[in-house]
Amino acid sequence: MKNPSFDWERLKDVFYRSRAIGELKWPTQYEEFKCALSLTVIAVEIQDFIQVYNYFGQLLGKINLQRIHEDIIKFEFDKDEKLILVTKSSIKIVKGWSPLTIESVPLQDPTIDTIWDYHNGIMLLAKSRDIYKLNGNEWELLYENKDKKYNLLTKNHWSCNDDSIILLDVDHVYQVSTSNGALLKLITDSSWHKVTISSRGFICLYNMKDNKLQIFRDPARILMEHNLDSTPDDICWCGNDTVACSFEDEIKLYGPDGLYVTFWYPFTVTNLRAEVDGLKVITTEKIYFLSRVQPQTSNIFRIGSTEPGAMLVDSFSLLEDHAPKAIEILKNFVLEKGVLDCIAAAIDEFEPKLQKMLLNAASYGKASLQYKSFDASIFVNACNTIKLLNCFRSFGIFLTVEEYRCISLKGVIDRLLKYHRYYECIQICKLANERFLLGYVFTEWAKDKIKGSPDMEDDELLDKIKSRLSVIDMTDTLQMVAVAKVAYLEGRFQLSRNLALLEKNEEARIEQLYNLDDDSIALKECIKVQNYSLTISLLIALSKKLTNSQLTKLLIIDMFNNPLYLYYMRMDKAYLYDFYRQTDRFIDLAHVLLQQGKEQQSLHSFLPQIKDLYSQVQNSEVVNNTIEQLQRQEKLWIYQESLGKRFAISFTNMTLDQTLSKLIETGQDKQVKEIVKKFKISEKKLYHLKCKTLVEAKKFDELLQFAQSRKSPIGYMPFYTYLKSRGHMDKASPYVNMIPGLSYQEKKKLYVECRGFRDAIQLAGKEKDIPGLKEIYNIIPPNEPELKALANETMSRI
């Protein structure tokens, strides 16, 4: 295998090389043609067409310039590789190739001034030389040259990158910031005729009169100066740190200390393009990539190198025939560094044979390291990257690893999708095992299929999309809503609806159906997935879009037995009233009025309506009972009004129990008997209410008198319990002896619980229960010495 270093050139301590990456296959019989390069494609203007090719010379798209109806003064690619056509009055951005889609960004008033030049999103006007920046689809004024601060004679007199614009005035050099338009004078009283700025801000100036190059980042510190032997055809950056000049059929790279290296080509050099890590050279027959040789690659292939990478490759080459010697070599260098160098060099190579050899050497070295001392993922990731880069190259996309890192895998996919190269995209996604990107490719294919198939019926298109969908089985990564939106914009509403129903994301699916005004389907889908928050959100949106009657109809049809929205609207009495009235739900409507009456503290005014609503329902025992209760309530209100007039006390909104309690509390025995008789209150309920009321009113004497007045129908335990639960322990003790059927132990326990220790001692003494007395003695608090003495005295008597 030929050593690749034989084709290298050395510039001081750095090696450079030029590698062919493609042959030009467009029609070359025309002498007059213009071309523009991007990272992955070439645009060529021949006669009345601009044709776009990949680096294999495959035609990807073309534009008939006669249909533009304006003279094209320039064309170039932007960072996303959209083709930009520059005319005097506008720029035209090619958004799509099949069908051809062009978006125009015109000047505000082309009658006042016209476009002079354009590059990398920056535009200069012809008369004023005002500077504009393309911001989305609008022009943003960066600097207005109203004082004629500078005058640019040719289009070589300016250059720009993402951060700065360099302007070569007749006498000075200016810099304009692309972020705020600030103008700065870099160099005064200095004349230059060409400028180019690198992506990292290094500036190269060329003076045609003196045939001199000057390179700097800060004008106060000149990095390099070169006096050239002849006038270059073009000047361009090779990467970010070396300047290249083209001279007919050769390229010269200039380094420090007046050094340079020359690369000769068998054909005339026509165009140059600076890349992040090198230079693309276009000749009349081929495309070359000129770049720095990475240190790892240089260490391995440099003649006589004893670096770890070179030693590992030597050892691997001897392994088959001279294994002992190969193993001995492994002991003479840092093996891990050799493995890493071979991996890095393999990624840097274009030739598969060299890649394979270097990876085999790295694998051999890795296997010779101690177990788990090397991160195997480095090797695996390198292999995957090399496979991807080789796959790209097989499709006519020649990327270095540095360029690939800059644009990412999705960037490669997007560039292929521009030209509808779906097969290549799918192959790349499968190789990279990128399920999400595969779904993205399918989504873009489906969108383009809809746009490009005006003669196909909706059902036919849907079947086509579904059949492709079943093959790739990537429904979890698809954005079917995006496809549905395209169908909607194309006027295919039924197709849009059916595609939206294929969307896996619930919120996106419902939103698209809502936007299509398929309210019923959207609501059914919400209910189907049982996403209650989403259902409520949809219904709120629908309530703003539909009338009340339309929304009610929707709820009746699709949510007849689902009270979710009614529960959400439970505080909106006006809505509930309207809904129940429209749906003839009389009982629910009565409940709304009942609640409204309670909230307004005027329930009696709503009662006739409520009774009338209940009467609409026939043959219902529950309804009949409710009507009886309402009549009873109405009767109570009338009685409460009479009581209020008689005693000047408000009984409004009191329940029957509260009314009775109030009468008991105020000592209105006559009215108590009257209300008991009038509303047929049971004796047991009366006793409970009176007992509870007197306890809460702390009328203990009256309570005891009430308890002793006659035999209680509820017994006397409730008296004891009410007093004890309210904290009136000392008042509860007398009722223990009234409770019939209690055993000695039960009575003693009740006395102790209500702290009736004296009664408990007397009871235990009567029963001659010394253990019980001791138990009581131990429970008596220390601050009750009299009770303790009584307990001792009682025990001594026994």
Curated annotation (Swiss-Prot):
Q: Which UniProt keywords apply?
A: Cytoplasm, Protein transport, Transport, Vacuole
Q: Name one GO biological process term.
A: vacuole organization
| Compartments where located | Cytoplasm; Vacuole
Question: Which GO molecular function annotation, any one, does this entry have?
Answer: actin binding
Protein transport found in the keyword field: yes
> Where is it predominantly found?
cytoplasm
Which GO terms of the cellular component aspect does the record hold?
A: CORVET complex; cytosol; early endosome membrane; endosome; fungal-type vacuole membrane; HOPS complex
Family, according to the entry, reads as follows:
Belongs to the VPS16 family.
- State what this protein does: Essential for vacuolar protein sorting. Required for vacuole biogenesis, stability and to maintain vacuole morphology. Required for growth at elevated temperatures. Acts as a component of the HOPS complex that acts during the docking stage of vacuole fusion. HOPS is an effector for the vacuolar Rab GTPase YPT7 and is required for vacuolar SNARE complex assembly. It remains bound to SNARE complexes after vacuole fusion.
> Other remarks on record?
Present with 1300 molecules/cell in log phase SD medium.
The protein's assembly and partners: Component of the HOPS complex which is composed of PEP5, VPS16, PEP3, VPS33, VPS39 and VPS41. HOPS associates with phosphoinositides and the PX domain of VAM7. Interacts with VAM7.
Q: What is this protein called?
A: Vacuolar protein sorting-associated protein 16
